[in-house]
């Protein structure tokens, strides 16, 4: 849908350009369309991705997020993939409590590195001098704000807004078709989860985050907004199958350092999705193992991106979450400490929640293996 710019009334969209990417190829040069809908035919068995720009006499807008779809050969069903990872932010920061507020402050990358837009080429390393009173003495001793330089030559991956394609590739591999949408369309009601037997909510590193210095505008990027909670609750009540993954699925509702927890949010997590928060910063090594449970037999080990790199955003603070119902179980644990990394629930509906983002798994083989296990659980109640 077009969005009006209140600061510039002439910036209205007149036409749109739809760009298409087939499989692992690049985007084409786009198709100019006159209205905000476009119909095309998809090849079978391959992920097709789309992005849209708006155009008028003044030029072309920035592109939209990238949404994808895929039609499987003899599909077992269709999965709705919801892209709920919109966050862009600076790292976590702190200012010491008074009277030390004039003495200590800085960024805490290990707590939350933040999320760059697409990629970051300016980051050089973690901050290491937090004392405000330390002056610049030399370029090698630059005082307050001084940082390590071990990432000076490296590109750091951020939010690329294209994760439905990664999830979709694993869904196709498991024999299911998929479509995708933004979380806003679900919240507004223009897309109904109830039309699909399976849903996959991508939360990435979504969590409530301040804008700028904070205190002027409300926090943004909440994992489960009130409209999303309502949509998910209705979907589960009708017997749906929901997969959710993200770094802060528990912390954002129980222990976000920027806001007080809301009991209604926690009730939604425990009574609808059937998990509860245990701890943030649950693991440092980025390794997960499947364990024996009613979910099914163990199907191997997994690893996710736990260090800064150019290929995928970093997961520095995964969540440990635990079952909140007798009918729920832990089916994955962090290898280094056995904290619960994934919870599955089987009742009148089924849920599967991970405390780390699915798309950050390092290899396609790992993603394919885990997605097949989850969809098999949804279909049969356990892995076969």
Predicted regions and their residues:
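Recognizes extended acidic, P/S/T-rich segments that occur
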Residues: 9-45
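Extracellular fibronectin type III
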Residues: 44, 55-77
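Hydrophobic/tyrosine-rich beta-strand signature of extracellular beta-sandwich/beta-rich modules
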Residues: 48-52
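Extracellular ligand-binding/catalytic regions of CAZymes and related secreted enzymes
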Residues: 74-78, 83-158, 236, 241, ...
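Helical hinge/lid and interdomain linker segments adjacent to catalytic or ligand-binding clefts
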Residues: 120-260
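Acidic carboxylate-rich catalytic motifs and surrounding loops in phosphoryl-/glycosyl-chemistry enzymes
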Residues: 179-188, 246-249, 279-286, 332-335, ...
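A glycine-rich, often tryptophan-bearing local segment used as a flexible ligand/cofactor-contacting loop or short
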Residues: 206-313, 328, 370
């Amino acid at each position: 849908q077009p969005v009006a710019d209140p600061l510039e009334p002439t910036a209205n969209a007149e036409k749109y350009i739809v760009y298409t990417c087939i499989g692992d190829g690049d985007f084409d040069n786009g198709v100019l369309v006159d209205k905000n809908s476009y119909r095309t035919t998809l090849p079978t068995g391959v992920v097709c991705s789309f992005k849209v720009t708006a155009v008028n006499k003044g030029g072309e807008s920035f592109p939209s997020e990238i949404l994808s779809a895929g039609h499987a050969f003899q599909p077992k069903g269709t999965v709705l993939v919801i892209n709920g990872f919109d966050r862009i932010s600076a790292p976590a920061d702190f200012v010491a409590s008074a009277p030390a507020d004039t003495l200590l402050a800085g960024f805490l990358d290990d707590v939350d590195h933040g999320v760059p837009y697409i990629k970051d080429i300016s980051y050089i390393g973690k901050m290491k001098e937090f004392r405000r009173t330390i002056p610049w003495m030399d370029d090698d001793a630059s005082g307050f704000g001084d940082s390590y330089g071990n990432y000076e030559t490296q590109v750091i991956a951020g939010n690329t807004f294209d994760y439905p394609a990664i999830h979709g590739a694993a869904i196709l591999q498991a024999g299911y078709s998929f479509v995708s949408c933004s979380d806003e369309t679900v919240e507004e009601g223009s897309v109904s989860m109830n039309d699909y037997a399976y849903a996959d909510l991508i939360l990435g590193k979504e969590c409530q985050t301040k804008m700028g210095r904070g205190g002027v505008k409300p926090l943004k990027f909440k994992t489960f907004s009130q409209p999303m909670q309502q949509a998910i609750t209705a979907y589960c009540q009708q017997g749906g199958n929901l997969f959710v993954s993200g770094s802060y699925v528990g912390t954002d509702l129980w222990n976000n350092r920027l806001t007080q927890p809301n009991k209604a949010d926690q009730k939604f997590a425990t009574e609808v999705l059937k998990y509860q928060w245990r701890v943030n910063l649950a693991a440092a090594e980025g390794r997960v193992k499947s364990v024996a449970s009613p979910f099914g037999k163990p199907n191997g080990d997994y690893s996710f991106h736990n260090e800064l790199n150019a290929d995928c955003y970093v997961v520095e603070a995964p969540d440990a979450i635990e079952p909140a119902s007798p009918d729920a179980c832990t089916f994955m644990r962090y290898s280094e400490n056995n904290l619960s990394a994934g919870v599955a629930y089987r009742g009148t509906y089924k849920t599967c929640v991970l405390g780390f983002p699915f798309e950050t798994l390092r290899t396609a083989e790992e993603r394919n293996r885990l997605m097949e296990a989850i969809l098999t659980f949804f279909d049969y109640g356990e892995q076969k």
